[in-house]
């Protein structure tokens, strides 16, 4: 009995250790950065036009500082296809002629003693796997860090509450300032070390998960 209890405890601990951490909406890792800029001193000139607040028509308004907002256009499409097959054939044939002793056949019950053995095996296996995914949309993110070479570390998330659950999109990566378009957008395909996560929490998300017993049968713990 103690042996079965030990086995059950081991399986439960393994299941608990493999349970992923549930995402939270207020994750500090994705919190926006608010740069602290010194207040701008406005000289009282008596004019409506203030030179300190003017902007040139030819200035670059693309995001380039920590805290600036950049829109990432999600254009992700992946497709993977794999096929494998093998065939094994094996055969053996052995024949032993009747045994002679003293010039006559050795028999048992009037039946000559001989041996005939034939064996064959044919195994054929085939497997195919085809998977494709696509993700289109957009999400605004913050510039979290400006690297020494001018590249920008961007990170952001978007949460949408729908009925009994929440859906979220999270993105983080590194972009070049030269790849940012004039409308302050950049394609997700131009991001390096991109991490894009689209998932959800709540009743509908839980319904799509595999139960712990099914996970055990599909894991490496199942010996068969």
Curated annotation (Swiss-Prot):
GO terms for biological process: bacterial-type flagellum-dependent cell motility. It is found in: Cell outer membrane; Bacterial flagellum basal body. GO terms for cellular component: bacterial-type flagellum basal body, distal rod, L ring; cell outer membrane. Residues 1-15 form the signal peptide. Its main location: membrane. Keywords: Bacterial flagellum, Cell outer membrane, Lipoprotein, Membrane, Palmitate, Signal. It is a lipid-anchor. A lipid is attached at residue 16 (S-diacylglycerol cysteine). InterPro entries: Flag_Lring (IPR000527). It comes from the Bacteria. PROSITE patterns: PROKAR_LIPOPROTEIN (PS51257). A lipid is attached at residue 16 (N-palmitoyl cysteine). The basal body constitutes a major portion of the flagellar organelle and consists of four rings (L,P,S, and M) mounted on a central rod. Assembles around the rod to form the L-ring and probably protects the motor/basal body from shearing forces during rotation. Belongs to the FlgH family. This is Flagellar L-ring protein. It comes from Shewanella sp. (strain ANA-3).
